[in-house]
């Protein structure tokens, strides 16, 4: 996984910087996501494994993508095909989105709660997190009844466990030590 991230990072960064320069970040995100979906297709997977010459593979891949990608994105795909890197397209698309969020000073926060939160509670969480992280926060909520009560918030490296299950677990660890 770390190797794929390392391979994908320069492609994502180059694409993002170009998209930013061209003021086309959204369209590039869409093109990369589409190309990533094509690369994950079960019919395309065997071709990406290296059984096809890079020039032919690039031509085939671009043909499948059709008009969904522009000339500059086609150039990126050609370079990736020449280097045998089309298989990392999903990671490139994911890192592109991360760069996009970082640039926009946005962060995605996972909120896991024991019960469904009200809109007022979600608003309060959003405001608090935005203040603490100095970024715009997008909340993704889910319910896990095993928490008993409370919430677990994960935003980037930050993890706040305010659940009863977490408190019981920490208390148990303290008593055992």
UniProtKB/Swiss-Prot annotation:
Keywords in alphabetical order: ATP synthesis, Cell inner membrane, Cell membrane, CF(1), Hydrogen ion transport, Ion transport, Membrane, Transport
Primary location class: membrane
Membrane topology: Peripheral membrane protein
Sections of the chain in a coiled coil: none
Keyword match Glycoprotein: no
GO MF term set: proton-transporting ATP synthase activity, rotational mechanism
One GO cellular component, as annotated: proton-transporting ATP synthase complex
Keyword Membrane assigned: yes
Function: F(1)F(0) ATP synthase produces ATP from ADP in the presence of a proton or sodium gradient. F-type ATPases consist of two structural domains, F(1) containing the extramembraneous catalytic core and F(0) containing the membrane proton channel, linked together by a central stalk and a peripheral stalk. During catalysis, ATP synthesis in the catalytic domain of F(1) is coupled via a rotary mechanism of the central stalk subunits to proton translocation.
Subunit structure of this chain's protein: F-type ATPases have 2 components, F(1) - the catalytic core - and F(0) - the membrane proton channel. F(1) has five subunits: alpha(3), beta(3), gamma(1), delta(1), epsilon(1). F(0) has three main subunits: a(1), b(2) and c(10-14). The alpha and beta chains form an alternating ring which encloses part of the gamma chain. F(1) is attached to F(0) by a central stalk formed by the gamma and epsilon chains, while a peripheral stalk is formed by the delta and b chains.
Official protein name in the record: ATP synthase subunit delta
Native species: Shewanella halifaxensis (strain HAW-EB4)
Gene (UniProt): atpH
InterPro entries xref list: ATP_synth_OSCP/delta_N_sf, ATPase_OSCP/dsu
Localisation: Cell inner membrane
Pfam families per UniProt: OSCP (PF00213)
The family this protein is said to belong to: Belongs to the ATPase delta chain family.
